[in-house]
Amino acid sequence: MTAYKPYRHQLRRSLFASTIFPVFLVIIIGLVSFYAIYIWIEHRTIHQHVDESQSSLHHTEKQIQTFITQHNNSFQELDLTNHHDVTATKRGLLKLIHQQPATLYYELSGPNQFITNNYEHLNTKNMYLFSTHQLKFKNSTYMLKIYMANTPRLSEIKKDSRQFALIVDQYDNILYANDDRFTIGEKYRPQQFGFMNESVKLNHADHRLIIYKDIHENIEDGITLLIVMAVVLVLLVIFGFISADNMAKRQTKDIETIIQKIYYAKNRHLGTYTPLKNNSELEEINNYIYDLFESNEQLIHSIEHTERRLRDIQLKEIERQFQPHFLFNTMQTIQYLITLSPKLAQTVVQQLSQMLRYSLRTNSHTVELNEELNYIEQYVAIQNIRFDDMIKLHIESSEEARHQTIGKMMLQPLIENAIKHGRDTESLDITIRLTLARQNLHVLVCDNGIGMSSSRLQYVRQSLNNDVFDTKHLGLNHLHNKAMIQYGSHARLHIFSKRNQGTLICYKIPLSRGNVDV
């Protein structure tokens, strides 16, 4: 029988795949989409911040340039050796610085003069040199340097968006940075992974403003999110597997019940009708199984009954074919004895009546071996009357063997065959030996008659396999066919014979079925 995988397992896998895999795909697609949207938003934000910062710095630069242009003539009338003019110059520059949103420091240097608003003496090397201008004063020409320490917009971008600003020259030397990871004066080397940046030109000196974002921090947050989602996914997998298994059990319970009923029906142990727990179209199959089982049982019982009747008919037919020639000969003997010896004729009639009563008994096809032997003794006694006591019957049997049950008329044909075909001498000795071995009764019938030639022996052996109704030789053929009907192929009959040396018939009868009325 082919081994099948339970349908419940296949359904469980299908349910599991149809629930967990879509969730897994949704999570993956969601993560990829989230990452793509995040990158897009960050790029857009950086672009916006670059534009805003560029505009703010250009506005500051324009205001400074406008201030210097407007006050250029005024500066030429001031003498920075004069204390009053120095104060006026400081006041004007401070006004310019305070009007700008950026944190600016100026340095005005000339011959023996240095003016600045860097009262805290901050290191201007860490500041961006925003612009330089030459200013002509009355006493001399001075150099004005304006440094940018920070701008509110860049600080706001750094605080709110974690985006940092760099200003580099045309050789990528860092001129300004509000991130401690970069040092002013070093080369700017953009990272290949984990950074997003955008740059824009600031001035004619090819200085560039770079706004960049370090996404490693977000990646760490993303990893944490991934771990959380992985845990959730594992829990979903476990929950999905348990749910799929329970659902598969519920959905296939009726199918498994039907399969079990089919198995019981094959072994003829189905029992009475029981409906399925769930009212579904499977109930049609359930009803059909019971209807088919009942029809099959009725058919089996009908076949068994027909076979029993056929065996009974065959057995009766065989038993009837044993009788005619014997009855005819016996009746002639009785007719002869009535005149010569009425008393002996009466004895023969009594023996014949007992034999007929035995052979015509219809309530059972099995008898004790002892009854069969009594029948044989009566049969031989009648035959001895016909043949002047020339037949000597010897029975060798244990008491246990005599009480075994065998089919009726299973031994008589052997004696009949010995008398019919072995009688050609003044005396015919027939020996019946009965032994028990391995649940079998072994019967040996030996006579000292004329025996058979090799060709005749071969013919008799072959005739045993002919159909009982197709042969004219009824003796051993009838017995063999009767044994095959009653005991099956377990019964064995072997014939051995030599010309003028007698005949030996070995017969094995299974006792395991002997007690059954077949």
Swiss-Prot record:
Autophosphorylated. Residues 297-513 form the Histidine kinase domain. The chain crosses the membrane at residues 20-40, 222-242. Keywords: ATP-binding, Cell membrane, Kinase, Membrane, Nucleotide-binding, Phosphoprotein, Transferase, Transmembrane, Transmembrane helix, Two-component regulatory system. It is an enzyme of class 2 (transferase). Gene3D superfamilies: Histidine kinase-like ATPase, C-terminal domain. GO terms for cellular component: plasma membrane. GO terms for molecular function: ATP binding; phosphorelay sensor kinase activity. It is a multi-pass membrane protein. Its EC number is 2.7.13.3. It is found in: Cell membrane. InterPro entries: Bact_2-comp_sensor_kinase (IPR050640), HATPase_C_sf (IPR036890), Sig_transdc_His_kin_internal (IPR010559). The modification Phosphohistidine is found at residue 325. It catalyses: ATP + protein L-histidine = ADP + protein N-phospho-L-histidine. Member of the two-component regulatory system HptS/HptR that regulates genes involved in hexose phosphate transport system in response to changes in extracellular phosphate sources. May act as a sensor protein kinase which is autophosphorylated at a histidine residue and transfers its phosphate group to the conserved aspartic acid residue in the regulatory domain of HptS. In turn, HptS antagonizes CcpA-dependent transcription of a subset of CcpA-regulated genes involved in antibiotic susceptibility. This is Sensor protein kinase HptS.
